[in-house]
Swiss-Prot record:
This is Large ribosomal subunit protein eL31. Keywords: Ribonucleoprotein, Ribosomal protein. Belongs to the eukaryotic ribosomal protein eL31 family. The keyword Ribosomal protein applies. GO terms for molecular function: structural constituent of ribosome. It comes from the Eukaryota. Disulfide bonds: none annotated. GO terms for cellular component: ribonucleoprotein complex; ribosome. The keyword Protein transport does not apply. CDD domains: Ribosomal_L31e. Pfam families: Ribosomal_L31e (PF01198). It comes from Encephalitozoon cuniculi (strain GB-M1) (Microsporidian parasite). GO terms for biological process: translation.
Length: 111
């Protein structure tokens, strides 16, 4: 488990969405899993700053409809300055398309 992510550092990680939303009702599951994904990333990196989900990742989460979400997703998390406020930092999450999730570990891509 990573303790803190530094400025302009990029980390790729796999998030098990089935585990995150196991207790959610099947109605409006995709909209709630976006909030749960943001909370999971904040908890993983021990950060209290905001998390920005890109359009590609959001479209992937809604690709099977609002009731059926994907089981796992591979994301690339980068700590950047906010577009709204230059003094604040945010965790930006991008979608990483992979063929299989087998034997994928967390890796630091850029520093």
């Amino acid at each position: 488990m990573w303790s803190k992510i530094e400025e302009n550092q990029t980390v790729e990680m796999t998030v098990n969405l089935r585990r995150i939303c196991s207790r959610l009702p099947w109605t409006k599951k995709a909209s709630k899993v976006v909030r749960m994904l943001k909370r999971e990333i904040q908890k993983h990196f021990r950060e209290e700053i905001g998390v920005v989900v890109t359009n590609d990742l959001n479209n992937f989460l809604y690709s099977r409809g609002i009731k059926k979400i994907p089981n796992k997703v591979r994301v690339r998390v980068t700590k950047e300055t906010s577009l709204k406020n230059a003094e604040e930092n945010v965790l930006k999450t991008d979608l990483v398309v992979v063929g299989s999730f087998k034997n994928l570990k967390e890796v630091i891509v850029d520093q």
